[in-house]
Regions:
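N-terminal glycine-rich FAD/FM-binding segment characteristic of electron-transfer flavoproteins
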Residues: 1-117
Length: 118
C-alpha cells in the first residue's frame, strides 16, 4: 500500500431530518486542527435525501469541501446503504483520516467501515 496516495481529513457529518447534529460540527473543528498540522484539507461527507442545502453550514464550520451523497434510500439511517456509500467514498478519495462521532449511528457505522477498509 502506497501511503502517499492517502491525504485529507474526512468527517462523516451526521444529520437527522435535514438538521446537522452537533457532533458533526464538533468533529469539523477537530478535523480542521488535524488537517492544519498535516497541511491537508477537510472534507465533509454528507449523506441523506435533499440535504445539499446543509453544505453551506458545513463550510462555515470548517469544511474545505463537501461531498454530498443524495438518495432517497439515505433519507433515514440504515446500516448497509450508509456503510456502502461511505466505503465507496473512502475507496475513491483515499483519506488519510476519517472521523465519525461516537453516537448511536457512529458506533454502528464506524466498526463496519473499519472492517471493510482493512
Amino acid at each position: 500500500m502506497d501511503k502517499s496516495q492517502y491525504k485529507n481529513v474526512f468527517v462523516f457529518c451526521e444529520q437527522r431530518g435535514g438538521k446537522l447534529q452537533n457532533v458533526a460540527l464538533e468533529l469539523l473543528g477537530k478535523a480542521h486542527d488535524l488537517a492544519k498540522d498535516l497541511n491537508q484539507e477537510v472534507y465533509a461527507m454528507l449523506l441523506g435525501h435533499n440535504v445539499k442545502s446543509l453544505s453551506e453550514e458545513l463550510i462555515a464550520h470548517g469544511a474545505d469541501k463537501v461531498l454530498v451523497v443524495d438518495d432517497a434510500c439515505l433519507e433515514n439511517y440504515t446500516t448497509e446503504p450508509y456503510t456502502q456509500a461511505i466505503f465507496q467514498i473512502i475507496c475513491e478519495q483515499k483519506p488519510s483520516i476519517v472521523l465519525i462521532g461516537a453516537t448511536t449511528i457512529g458506533r454502528d457505522l464506524g466498526p463496519r467501515l473499519s472492517a471493510r477498509v482493512t
